[in-house]
Design a protein with these regions (language model features):
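Positively charged n-region of N-terminal signal peptides that target proteins for export
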Residues: 1-4
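C-terminal segment of classical bacterial N-terminal signal peptides
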Residues: 14-23
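Calcium-binding acidic motifs and repeat modules
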Residues: 22-77, 87-94
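Auxiliary, metal-adjacent structural segments of Zn-dependent hydrolase domains
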Residues: 28-36, 40-56, 114-177
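Short alpha-helical catalytic segment bearing the HExxH-like zincin motif
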Residues: 75-79, 84, 193-201
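Acidic/histidine-rich, surface-exposed loop or edge segments in extracytoplasmic proteins
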Residues: 95-112, 180
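Zinc-dependent metallopeptidase catalytic helix centered on the HExxH motif
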Residues: 171-247
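Acidic/His/Gly-enriched intrinsically disordered linker/tail segments
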Residues: 212-277, 283-290, 304-324, 328-363
């Protein structure tokens, strides 16, 4: 019996001795610095709920409530003596980039119906193909971009752009703007081009944004804009130059397409030749299995995006279309040339009928 009592006492003593060891496992840790503490408690520590709530009201992220941890570390780390250790300010929400905008400078020489349609076209285009935020990476383009528009019947009324004329995206190296000098004859004759040109120049801004203003090739740049111009006309006005097969198209478009890579060939009337090449590329992609919509998306959107990553346009071409530029040029041999039936055209021409897009093709389906 005595032996049993001794054993029980021994067990009690051992248990009592083990108790401090167990309690030490839950003892609050002493942190050497806030950096050390924040690894465990990323928002810091509050001594109680009241201190936590006060911290949140003051703009801090909600700290962990732990009286033990606070008591262990407050003498060194609670520098403000406010019941908070290593409090952290709430992260500022990431500011969302403002949509790219245009500043419209419309001269009074333009009639009210043109101004109304101009605003409608700009609204439609903004919904169909919004300007990518990538344009903020182009150093000489700022938002809002100025648009200067006037009737050619008057001299350029904007002294800030001396010498400006015609329709273009122009700049001085530090800033970029859009010029829309609308021919008086187009306004008088109700020529659709007075509206279509807006889509053409807008698309150039879209191209600049998607490609980060990468230098490319004229026929894809201007040809793409011409195609968008005519697709817009087809979709919103019910007719376009596709109905007339983009005539005239110089035979050089299929005989020596390389000359359309740069401006100044003298054989690209109204960019019809460049547009033909873009349409022929779309047809080639369809023959390889792409849908019509997907082929035009690849040309008008994807190639521009690839150009932002690969500045060599011929390499970007291969990456986007899975063929070389030379292979595409060889495919143009399938399109015959012929003498023009128009007396005022002295050169051979190409019939664009085989490459004209369908009437059901829309900008919505391409850019959605």
């Amino acid at each position: 019996m005595k032996k049993l009592i001794i054993m029980l006492v021994s067990i009690f003593i051992v248990a009592g001795m083990s108790s401090p060891a167990q309690s030490s496992q839950v003892t609050a840790k002493k942190y050497s610095s806030c950096a050390d503490m924040l690894k465990k408690y990323p928002n810091g520590v509050a001594k109680n709920i009241k201190a936590r709530n006060k911290a949140v009201k003051s703009g801090l992220s909600a700290p962990k409530v732990s009286k033990k941890v606070y008591k262990k570390n407050n003498n060194r780390l609670d520098k403000n003596n406010n019941g908070i250790i290593c409090g952290q300010k709430k992260a500022e929400p990431v500011a969302k980039a403002e949509p790219f905008a245009f500043a419209k400078n419309i001269d009074a020489s333009l009639p009210a119906d043109w101004v109304a349609e101009f605003n409608q076209v700009m609204s439609n285009l903004g919904q169909l193909m919004p300007i990518s935020e990538k344009i903020n990476e182009v150093s000489n383009v700022q938002s809002p971009m100025n648009i200067y528009a006037w009737n050619s019947a008057v001299s350029n009324p904007f002294p800030q752009i001396p010498g400006a004329q015609g329709a273009s995206i122009s700049g001085n190296g530090s800033s970029t703007w859009m010029v829309l000098e609308i021919p008086e004859s187009e306004l008088r004759d109700k020529d659709l081009h007075r509206f279509k040109v807006i889509a053409h120049e807008y698309f150039h801004v879209y191209q600049i944004a998607m490609s980060r203003d990468a230098e490319g090739t004229q026929w894809l740049w201007e040809g793409g804009a011409k195609v968008v111009e005519e697709l817009y006309s087809q979709q919103f006005y019910g007719r376009s130059l596709f109905d007339e097969q983009l005539m005239p198209i110089h035979a050089a478009a299929v005989q020596t397409p390389k000359i359309f890579e740069n401006y100044g060939s003298g054989k690209d009337m109204n960019y019809n030749g460049s547009a033909f090449l873009a349409l022929a590329l779309a047809k080639e992609l369809q023959q390889q299995g792409m849908s019509e919509e997907r082929a035009f998306t690849a040309i008008l959107r994807d190639f521009q995006a690839e150009s932002a990553q690969e500045p060599d346009w011929k390499k970007a071409f291969v990456n986007t279309f899975n063929m070389t530029v030379e292979q595409f040029y060889q495919s143009l041999r399938q399109y015959p040339t012929a003498e023009s039936t128009q007396d005022w055209i002295s050169h051979r021409v190409v019939d664009a009928t085989p490459v004209v897009p369908s009437k059901t093709l829309t900008l919505n389906s391409i850019f959605s």
